C-alpha cells in the first residue's frame, strides 16, 4: 500500500534526536520555512518575489507565489513532524528543483549561493532526496514480507 493512516500519525520515535536520520529530516523541513517567509514583505507578496516569478515564466506570478508558499509550508511541516515523510521529502526535492530551474532562467548559470547561484537549493534537494530514499526504504521494510527463503534461515540452536 502506498499510503496508510499510519503515515499521518505522530510518533515519539520521529523525535528521537539520537537518530541522525530524524535530525536530517527535521532540518530539511525547517530550512523550507525561510523560503516561505522570504516571499512576503509586510504581510503581502514581496514586489521582488513577484518580479522574480514573472521573469522565471510563472504567470500570474502572485498565484504561483501562493502555490509555492503553501507547498513549501506543507512539505516543511510534514518533514518536521515526520508525517508522510517519503512524499514530503520528494515534494521538497521537486520544489527545490523548480527553484534551481527558476534561478537558471532568471540569472543564468551561477553556482555559489553568495552570488545568487543555486548551490544552496541543489544541496538541500540532494539532502531531501536522501531523506526520501531512507523513508522509502523504512516503509518497504515494514510493508514487504522478507524475501529470504525459509530454508536459508539459520535455525536457533537449543
Please name every model-derived segment.
Residues 41-60:
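Membrane-interface interhelical connector segments
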Residues 1-41, 62-70, 74, 81-158:
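Extended, low-polarity transmembrane helix blocks
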Amino acid at each position: 500500500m502506498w499510503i496508510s493512516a499510519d503515515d499521518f500519525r505522530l510518533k515519539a520515535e520521529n523525535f528521537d534526536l539520537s537518530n541522525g536520520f530524524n535530525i536530517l529530516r527535521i532540518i530539511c523541513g525547517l530550512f523550507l520555512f525561510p523560503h516561505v517567509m522570504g516571499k512576503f514583505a509586510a504581510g503581502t507578496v514581496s514586489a521582488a518575489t513577484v518580479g522574480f516569478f514573472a521573469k522565471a515564466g510563472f504567470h500570474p506570478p502572485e498565484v504561483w507565489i501562493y502555490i509555492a508558499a503553501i507547498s513549501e509550508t506543507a512539505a516543511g511541516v510534514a518533514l518536521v513532524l515526520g508525517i508522510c515523510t517519503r512524499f514530503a521529502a520528494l515534494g521538497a526535492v521537486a520544489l527545490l528543483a523548480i527553484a534551481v530551474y527558476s534561478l537558471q532562467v532568471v540569472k543564468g548559470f551561477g553556482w555559489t549561493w553568495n552570488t545568487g547561484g543555486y548551490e544552496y537549493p541543489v544541496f538541500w534537494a540532494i539532502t531531501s532526496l536522501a531523506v526520501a530514499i531512507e523513508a522509502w526504504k523504512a516503509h518497504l521494510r515494514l510493508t514487504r514480507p522478507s524475501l529470504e527463503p525459509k530454508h536459508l534461515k539459520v535455525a536457533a540452536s537449543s
